[in-house]
Curated annotation (Swiss-Prot):
Effect the entry attributes to changing H51A: Relative activity reduced to 16% of wild-type
Protein species of origin: Streptomyces glaucescens
Name the record gives this protein: Tetracenomycin F2 cyclase
Gene3D superfamilies, alphabetized: Dimeric alpha+beta barrel
EC number(s) given by UniProt: 4.2.1.154
Pathway where this protein functions: Antibiotic biosynthesis; tetracenomycin C biosynthesis
GO MF, one annotated term: lyase activity
Catalytically driven reaction(s): tetracenomycin F2 + H(+) = tetracenomycin F1 + H2O
Length: 109
């Protein structure tokens, strides 16, 4: 995978099953592949929710374009009742994207 995006939000740990179920259903639709998502991994740590998206290339533009798609709106509405922004100044999707500040790759990779 050449591209990764890590989104960070807040979530009550008790709601993890609901969020996972929403994405499990969503990932059976055509939309993730249309956007270019190759892998999705959800993490939780106390009240933090981390959403790792992996793709072959940068998908953020396609992700923004998909916001008007009914399947995107459906999953967003479902998980939106369980997730809240981490940052108080959150305005849009990109405001929850973690910034890479160090990366290492083994020489033989």
């Amino acid at each position: 995978m050449a591209y990764r995006a890590l989104m960070v939000l807040r979530m009550d740990p008790a709601d993890a099953e609901h969020v996972a179920a929403a994405f499990a259903e969503h990932d059976t639709t055509e939309l993730p592949l249309e956007i270019g998502v190759r892998r999705r991994v959800l993490f939780r740590f106390h009240d933090l929710y981390m959403h790792l998206i992996e793709a072959d290339d940068d998908i953020m533009e396609r992700l923004y374009q998909a916001r008007s798609h009914p399947l995107f709106q459906e999953v967003n509405e479902r998980v939106g009742q369980y997730l809240t922004p981490y940052a108080q100044d959150w305005e849009e999707l990109k405001d929850s994207k973690a910034e890479v500040f160090y990366s290492w790759t083994a020489p033989d990779s």
